[in-house]
Amino acid sequence: MALTSAASTDAPPTTGFWALTLGGVGVVFGDIGTSPLYAFREAVHVAAEGAQVTRVIVLGVLSLILWSLFIVVTAKYVLLLLRADNNGEGGTLSLMALGQRAIGRRSVFLMSLGVIGASMFIGDSMITPAISVLSAVEGLKIAAPALEHYVVPLTVGILVVLFAFQRWGTARVASAFGPVMIVWFSTLAVMGLIHINDDPSVLAAINPWHAVHFMLSHGMVGLVTIGAVFLAVTGGEALYADLGHFGRKPIQTGWLFFVLPSLLINYFGQGALVLSHPEAVENTFYRMVPESFLVPLIVLATAATVIASQAVITGAFSLISQAVQLGLLPRFEVRYTSETHAGQIYLPRVNMLLLIGVLMLVLLFRNSSGLASAYGIAVSTTMVADGVMGFVVIWKLWGWRPAAAAALIFPFVAVDAIFFSANLLKLLEGAWVPLLFGLLMATLIWVWRRGSAMLILKTRRTEVPLNDLIQSLEKRPPHIVKGTAVFLTSDPEYVPTALLHNLKHNKVLHEHNVILTIQTAQTPRVDPAERVTMENISDKFSKVRLRFGYMESPNVPKALVIARKLGWQFDIMSTSFFVSRRSLKPAAQSGLPRWQNHLFIALSRSANDATDYFQIPTGRVVEVGTQVTI
């Protein structure tokens, strides 16, 4: 039979270019924009090894920072990967989906890269709030040394308030993020310009030879220093992840003409300060201003780090939501904090887990220098994964020859690999923490995927083909009742469990029965014209398929209204939704190792109710329970 579809009249809102650029400055660059608080200081400390800071060290570190920002952030992300958008969206999972779409099938290799990159992003989303807020509050030690003991408690208090605030969303205060960060970056530039005059010869670091000379003359210390230099580019991957929110041009404009110059000027100002006043290396950032300006700068830095942390938290919510839609994780409870912005979501469980992880990091390391050792490994792993997946997109989707695609992307991957190796050297000093968080996340995804596949295989053995049931009901029709019954199922070729139970226990059949399947596309959003597909298979049965993008919130009743254009007189008040709820029990002989079996069952039990997740009115739902051993 012919398949039909209908379109919706909904249209995405449009925002002015400069408004998007301002918004991007407030959200996209928060993480990388707060790196001057600690990046240069930590790199110089590592390079000096406790000895006197020399001119070679300062110029070498500055040159490494400059060219890292040029190569990794500007060339790789801003100029190249921002063009690899998946229907306007960016980020690790979007790149994974784009690569799979490009090769025309699901790839275990690409899936693994996407999972690794996403898992490491979650690890990074715990470290960023901790190190950012802690480094800002540490300015109190300079303003008032007697307050040093209050740095950690104050940091904990700020973070608890920040995470507690998530339940109300950020829509009301987000408009202030842009102006605050404009002030922040402008302040960075002014501070840098003032101190470059202390020793203008610091500008010689623009010559990449100083980076090469430093590496050649410092051996293994140089490689360890690269791990600290990487702190200056952490957050670069966020430029790509936020592509869908602000667009390529606004992000490129904000970076190239405002954020990058401000960062470089500040770093060079810190370098000039250390060359003229070596004692300032203790905390180069806060030593750039006189004591009378310390408190206002601490307040501004704290505001900037809170905004940066907010962007990372929001990114974590978005990534987990995408992972759920792609079937990588169970359905977590999602609350919508804005009636006008679909992307404003709050995941209570994820928020609590992030808060616990962040507080553990603050209490474990207690200062930003300690956390700096843990920072970087997660981001560098994500960047390597992005680079390899980018090669697939350039080759398969853009149509480049493999050699040309490799020549373009693998120099960036090589640089990312060097940063990754350098960060591995900090494994025992703290880099194990984000790796542990990432490993735990990847394990959850792996077990959920494996358990779900095994559950499908097990239930398939007892399922009845839908066409066989329809033929049987036509020969021996049961009692027919008025109304419409919608049966949710993952496979429309087989009879939903709820339908079998309805026939077995109630011995009735509705006059209209809809076998409803909800699919997630490999695109962030689905064109409304392709949202609903309907197929009539008999007088009493029809199949309806709803397609949602992996960044969309599946709203079943709203989508079914579109079916009216296909001839189905859908009325929510005369429709009953039948949902099957599985109760999983461990089998005596499971196909999974014992620990995986119990973990999968625990994940399944923690999943949000399908009724709530698909936004179906609870008063119209009939839930049928079944017990399955796995």
UniProtKB/Swiss-Prot annotation:
GO terms for molecular function: potassium ion transmembrane transporter activity; symporter activity. The chain crosses the membrane at residues 17-37, 56-76, 108-128, 145-165, 176-196, 214-234, 255-275, 293-313, 345-365, 375-395, 402-422, 427-447. One of its GO terms (cellular component) is plasma membrane. It is found in: Cell inner membrane. It catalyses: K(+)(in) + H(+)(in) = K(+)(out) + H(+)(out). InterPro entries: K+_transporter, K_trans_C, K_trans_N, Kup. HAMAP family: Kup. This is Probable potassium transport system protein Kup 2. It comes from Rhodopseudomonas palustris (strain BisB18). The lineage of its organism: Bacteria, Pseudomonadati, Pseudomonadota, Alphaproteobacteria, Hyphomicrobiales.
